C-alpha cells in the first residue's frame, strides 16, 4: 500500500481493492480497512448500516476501530439516534467534513453533545460518506483523526475511494446485494455505437 497520502498512486488503491476482494469475513474486511486507512494517514474508521445498533443482525454492517469506550457509549446511550454526522452527511452525495455540519443542518443541543462526547474520546475531525441504494439499508463510512484540521481534497478523495471498495465488499459479505435488480435503460441506443 501507499507510503503516505501525498505519494499515493492509483495502484495503492488497487492493492486495497484486491485485499478486500480476498476476505471472507467482516472481521477480515475490518482488518484490511484498518490497515489501509492508517497507510493513508487516518486513525479511525467506521462502516455502519443505518438503524438500531443495539439490535445487531448478521446482515448488518458494523465495522469500526473507534475506541471501544466510545463504541460502548454510542450503543448503550443510543447516541446513533441523534448523531449529527449521519443526519448531515445523509444530505450530501459525496461526503461531508464534520466541521461543515452546521452548514447543512441546524444541530440541536443534543446533537452537539454527541459531537462533544466523541471529541472526549479523541474523534476530533472526520469525513463521512453516505451510501444510499434503493431497496437497501443506508450506510455510512467515516474516517476520523485526533487533529482538529479540515480534510484536504486529496484526503477526501482518498476516503471516498476506500469507502466505495469497503462498502461494496461489506455488502457482499453480509448479503446486502439485491439479487434481482431490475434492468433500467438510462440511454437510448445510438446508431453506430453497437
Q: What is each of the regions a protein language model found here?
A:
Residues 132-145:
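Sensory-domain boundary capping and coupling elements
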Residues 65-109, 115-119:
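Regulatory sensory and allosteric helical modules in signal-transduction proteins
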Residues 125-131:
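Short hydrophobic beta-strand micro-motif common in sensory/regulatory domains
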Residues 11-24:
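Short regulatory/linker helices and ligand/cofactor-binding micro-motifs at input modules
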Residues 144-157:
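Regulatory loop-to-helix N-cap segments in sensory/regulatory domains
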Residues 23-59:
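Helix-loop-beta substructure at the N-terminus of cytosolic sensory domains
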Amino acid at each position: 500500500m501507499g507510503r503516505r497520502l501525498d505519494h499515493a498512486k492509483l495502484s495503492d488503491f488497487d492493492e486495497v481493492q484486491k485485499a478486500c476482494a480476498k476476505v471472507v469475513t467482516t472481521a477480515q474486511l475490518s482488518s484490511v480497512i484498518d490497515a489501509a486507512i492508517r497507510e493513508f494517514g487516518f486513525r479511525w474508521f467506521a462502516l455502519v448500516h443505518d438503524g438500531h445498533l443495539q439490535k445487531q443482525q448478521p446482515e448488518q454492517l458494523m465495522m469500526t476501530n473507534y475506541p471501544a469506550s466510545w463504541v460502548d457509549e454510542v450503543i448503550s446511550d443510543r447516541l446513533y439516534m441523534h448523531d449529527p454526522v449521519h443526519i448531515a452527511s445523509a444530505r450530501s452525495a459525496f461526503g461531508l467534513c464534520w466541521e461543515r455540519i452546521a452548514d447543512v443542518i441546524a444541530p440541536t443541543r443534543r446533537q452537539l453533545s454527541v459531537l462533544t462526547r466523541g471529541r472526549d474520546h479523541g474523534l476530533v475531525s472526520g469525513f463521512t460518506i453516505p451510501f444510499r441504494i434503493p431497496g437497501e439499508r443506508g450506510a455510512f463510512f467515516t474516517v476520523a483523526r485526533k487533529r482538529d484540521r479540515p480534510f484536504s481534497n486529496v484526503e477526501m478523495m482518498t476516503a471516498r475511494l476506500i469507502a466505495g471498495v469497503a462498502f461494496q465488499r461489506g455488502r457482499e459479505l453480509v448479503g446486502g446485494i439485491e439479487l434481482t435488480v431490475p434492468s433500467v435503460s438510462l440511454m437510448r441506443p445510438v446508431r453506430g455505437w453497437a
